[in-house]
């Protein structure tokens, strides 16, 4: 089996990654950074997001494993002191995996005919800096609402516990194929109205955002952001590709939610 280690730059993580590298070689694994079968992310959820985007061009061909060097993360099944158990799990691997949906993003710009395509694991946002964003929101190409506020966030189920949750979005089990749109500081009064709550759409439905100002907007996809540009529309859909995690020991989702946000293990 060919594996690679994708680690962040912290001193603790470098030490763990070095130990993992040594033990992988001793166990007979081949280290291949170009065409791995498994990507071992060492760090936190941010490191795994970076690893996903680094290998997104071959996401159909790799599986991911997260090793956390801090507190419990949503994408990490192993702790830094469990390297030996992880190695044993890899030695017994038979290709088992759990897969989650990804977000496909297509952007059309007002100043060019080109369309940019992005893939996100967590979420994508659209914001207008310095003033209120006005945008028409379409679901399945039918006008749903005219939004006024700071911006909009569209997330995957796995991303529902990230930025989406901080702006009032719902937490969705990652095995569901769905998209969620959450409003960021929407304006609601007697003159201007939005739904004022998160919207969850079916896996075959698209969400399209069409800004109503000839202005520059900031677009993000996970950790990546773009320079402000005049955007004509952004179309969101469930991607036809999925991310796969090696299922040697996949922790229960609701247990992670309770541990991370409620502190059930401390009560």
Curated annotation (Swiss-Prot):
GO biological process entries: NAD metabolic process; NADP biosynthetic process
Role noted for this protein: Involved in the regulation of the intracellular balance of NAD and NADP, and is a key enzyme in the biosynthesis of NADP. Catalyzes specifically the phosphorylation on 2'-hydroxyl of the adenosine moiety of NAD to yield NADP.
Name assigned to this protein: NAD kinase
Catalytic site positions: 45
Cofactor: a divalent metal cation
Keyword Membrane: no
Binding site for NAD(+): 45-46, 122-123, 148, 150, 161-166, 185, 223
Enzyme class: transferase
Organism encoding this protein: Lactiplantibacillus plantarum (strain ATCC BAA-793 / NCIMB 8826 / WCFS1)
EC number(s) recorded for this UniProt protein: 2.7.1.23
